[in-house]
Structure formats: structure tokens, C-alpha cells
Amino acid sequence: MQIFEIKTHQIGRTYAKPHFFILNKGLNSGKPLDKPCPNCFVITTITRAERESLYYLCLSLKVGQFFAYYLKGSVIPFIGISDAKKVINAALQNYETHQWQMKVEKLKKITAFEENLQQQLSTIAKLKIALLKAQI
């Protein structure tokens, strides 16, 4: 079983161990992030491989809306640190290493493809603006 530690992120703090952040407020609670934000938890691991595996596990849990059940609050929903840890630990108990590594590799490729498409859309939007400005 993987060993990880989850804490509330303090702005300005740096971490020596491999880590990532998960958003804890709003409808995107549970979303893994590479860079910190004011409303997030930090998950630290021992190795980079564990960090990567947990990152994509949290991404899968977010997309599958497993964190949504634990959201509290009426105006700004949030997830508590104990609930986030409970969801992650439950998912870790159900995961098989070999199959999960294959899924992580596929998720990496999909994420890279998605970023490429977003960059292409941005370039097309700029091209459209340049074309319209050239017409005037």
C-alpha cells in the first residue's frame, strides 16, 4: 500500500518530498493541481512514482465525482481533509498495481493530447482575430 501524507497547504511553504495539491473549495474540490492555490491540500509521497500514481488516482476520483458526495456547505461547497483522505484510501484499497499503471500511462497520453488541443484552439482563435483585423 502506498504511503502518503495529506495536510492543509500554507501559502509560501515549500516541500522537499514529491508532492501535488488538491483543491478543497468549490465545485472542483478534489481536483489535483501541480501548482498551489490558497484553498488546497498538499499530498506528499516518498517517491515520484507514488506521487504520479496518486495524482492520476485523484484525477480519476474527481472526474468520477467521488469527492462530490462529501462536499459540505451551501454557498461555497468544500471537502474536509478527513473526507478527502477517506476517499483516497478507499480507492487505494480497490486498486491493482499493474492495471493501474496501464491506466496512468493512458491518462498521461490523454492529458497531453488535451493540452495540445487546447493550444490549437487558442492558436485558431488568435488566427481568427488576426484575419478579422486584416479585413478592416
Question: Which ranges hold each PLM region?
Answer:
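A short acidic, often aromatic-flanked loop/helix-cap motif at beta-alpha or helix-coil junctions
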Residues: I11-G12, R51, Y95-T97
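A short, structural micro-pattern
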Residues: Y15, K35-C37, I81
